[in-house]
């Protein structure tokens, strides 16, 4: 059952109605309402507006819930696909029985940059905000110095439009070492 379906069902129960009563009141087939509640059919604009009117909800509330649920589902699917691709290239060789839920966002971003291709990297920008990806890249990868230097130059130029990437990378690395020395 979808979240929207659960919400509609709770509104029906809390109001002391049954699906047949609501369907009759708003002029739709009970089976259509049942399919939406069960999550087997998407909520249409006219039906959403009728339900919102009947239950005195804000306009767009049900459609917003439906859209948010679809975005969440899409992002979970995308993350699972990226983890699957990483498993195919043996990026998690030291892990046993790993799933998408086990991988932190930081680790996923780092592994995708290191092990996967441009098309997969582009998917990161659908999953996460650009600033978050840049922060993870800067905190986890840039500080590794020469080990990932060429990759980091490409990432700096291609994804973050950094004009002088070599200088930028050296500066971030120096700042990181300075922090380590100051806190030692």
Describe each PLM feature range.
Residues 1-17:
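A short, Lys/Arg-rich alpha-helix, primarily the initiator
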Residues 12, 23, 52:
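The alpha-helix within a helix-turn-helix
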Residues 61-78:
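Short amphipathic recognition helices of helix-turn-helix/homeodomain-type DNA-binding modules
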């Amino acid at each position: 059952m979808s979240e929207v379906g659960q919400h509609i069902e709770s509104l029906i129960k809390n109001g002391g109605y049954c699906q047949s009563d609501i369907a009759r009141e708003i002029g739709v087939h009970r089976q259509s309402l049942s399919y939406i509640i069960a999550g087997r059919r998407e909520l249409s604009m006219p039906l959403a507006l009728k339900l919102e009117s009947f239950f005195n909800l804000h306009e767009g509330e049900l459609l917003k819930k439906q859209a948010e649920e679809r975005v969440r589902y899409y992002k979970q699917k995308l993350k699972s696909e990226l983890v699957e691709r990483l498993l195919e290239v043996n990026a998690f060789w030291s892990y046993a029985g790993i799933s998408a839920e086990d991988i932190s966002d930081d680790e996923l971003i780092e592994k995708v940059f290191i092990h996967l291709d441009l098309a997969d990297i582009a998917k990161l920008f659908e999953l996460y905000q650009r600033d978050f990806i840049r922060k993870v890249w800067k905190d986890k990868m840039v500080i590794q110095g020469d080990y990932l230097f060429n990759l980091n130059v490409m990432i700096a130029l291609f994804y973050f439009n950094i004009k002088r990437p070599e200088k930028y990378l050296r500066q971030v690395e120096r700042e990181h070492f300075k922090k380590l020395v100051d806190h030692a």
